[in-house]
């Protein structure tokens, strides 16, 4: 079955790549006044085969727009501008080091072409692995091969599909999140401390909302304690789980200190390429290594830049996006938000109704064993609420599609047990929505138009 899921995932990625290629060549790009990775005005540094560089850059140019420009800039230059601090390091740093390794191996491409190629290739590879992890996670949760397959199917053609192939961190985050959830659900004899720690660290350093995934090991740690019999081996496993969480938090704060050092310590000086400095002056960006200029977040009690950067550069905050001019973006995000709000509410309502009368010291163990999906739905409900109230509403679809398996589980419940899908059924409407958003989103995104 894993081979079948991999083929499905790879097929969906090839389809996205082909559609973006055709759309990018057929339609001229929109040119919004947004961040573009600064390029040197000097002679272009081509590889030994300039035509090969041009082929890669032209063929994949539709996958570098919007936030992709930030990720590629970080992969090439690291955190040179303060506004790049909105993007966490896992994806761009991995791309950077893999591209450097490819250069050392003699791959005949320029640095820019190689970084773009690696960024896309890694996402395709990790996407296939993520589809398999989602299948395993669903199977472990429900023990239903049909539902597991349908969840993987919907994931492969999800409504935010383009963002899982473009130079975005969605694929890496989905892989880290689903892997963490799978590790948390393993039995004690199958528990692997390193895997849990690595997955949790991946969540923390991939996206800001990755911090919410700390709730999973905490929940399952508490669950193990409440259900434990007190054996020495079990206590040792719980200790290792706690240690893995502490190590992951330590690595996250190492990144925070690195950023604080770059932007807040006056004795740190950073040499930048001239075109990077010129672009900063043109856009009035605060550049790293200039602590004398200063930034307000450096003086915070907990000097974490993310909230300040999002508020200052993108006007992100409670209900700030509720403006009439943003109505089209609200309409784009509406299907995902309505779907998630309703199903999370319905699940929690039924859970409360079924367990309210059972809440007692003698019954809590049975409740914990029976409702193992509760932390997953609660996590999804919190994310959906955050999307509705705080973030730029158009990112809701891709944020939820990459952060929680619950969307795919709820959607899989509508799918038939056979391949006979009626487009007039709820399953048909759901699949049409996914395919339409996947297709239209790929066409619009690849031509630099806004998309959800």
From Swiss-Prot:
Its EC number is 2.4.1.-. Keywords: Endoplasmic reticulum, Glycosyltransferase, GPI-anchor biosynthesis, Membrane, Transferase, Transmembrane, Transmembrane helix. This is GPI mannosyltransferase 2. One of its GO terms (biological process) is GPI anchor biosynthetic process. Its main location: endoplasmic reticulum. InterPro entries: PIG-V/Gpi18. GO terms for molecular function: alpha-1,6-mannosyltransferase activity; glycolipid mannosyltransferase activity. Residues 1-7, 135-161, 231-238, 306-327, 392-398, 448-452 are cytoplasmic. It is an enzyme of class 2 (transferase).
